[in-house]
Amino acid sequence: MINESVVLVFVEEEAEKNSIYNTIEKIGQVCNFEEQKPFQITKRLKIICNNYKVNVEENVLQYLIECCGTNMQDLINETRKLIEFAGENGKIQKQDIDKLCIKKIESVIFDLTDNLGQKKVKEAMDVLYNLITAKEPVQKILITLYNHFKKLYFVKIAVANNKDVATSLNLKANQMFLVNKYKLQAKGFKTSELRKIIQELQDLDYKYKIGLIDLNVGLEAILCAYCS
């Protein structure tokens, strides 16, 4: 026996309006669930905080999203942690996020690169050592650094040629807040410097794979050489 109503869920990057789509739309109802944009996520997190009588500024919630990503379940878990720490009638501060929340490696790499752009070698090395101490695989750190510097290079090229940065980086609708962060950070590097760092990270990966160098030593050498 067929139920009177059936819910079909299709998970796709984009809704392709083919014959199946058109048929379903004709005889039923189509509802498209887009990924939430940062302002929508901020609004939901604010409601959660209000329910527990905890105050938080919008810019602090935006910082939480920058640090922890846009996955709603991750953000709810981190928000609950912050709510417990602040307590009823308390207030969540930016420094609470730095102390308590589990940051995405991409966010930490942003911090590391900020320090590199300002030639702060000690601070950059501290971020690297903290990642290693947190048991983050060094190979993953290398790959994330490489991808990050590639994005900064793409930003430089896009800005120089009056191209759209979001399109050049293939950012999703809920990642648009990253555009200004990338543009601001890219200003701290020359295009030639970014090319050189990217090449050095590629060379390090190759030398590591053939057993010529330790990854930790190689990363430290690249970071220190840039800041010198």
Each language-model region and where it sits:
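Non-catalytic interfacial helical region
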Residues: 1-114, 187, 202-215, 221-228
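C-terminal alpha-helical interaction modules of replication/initiation AAA+ assemblies
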Residues: 108-111, 123-228
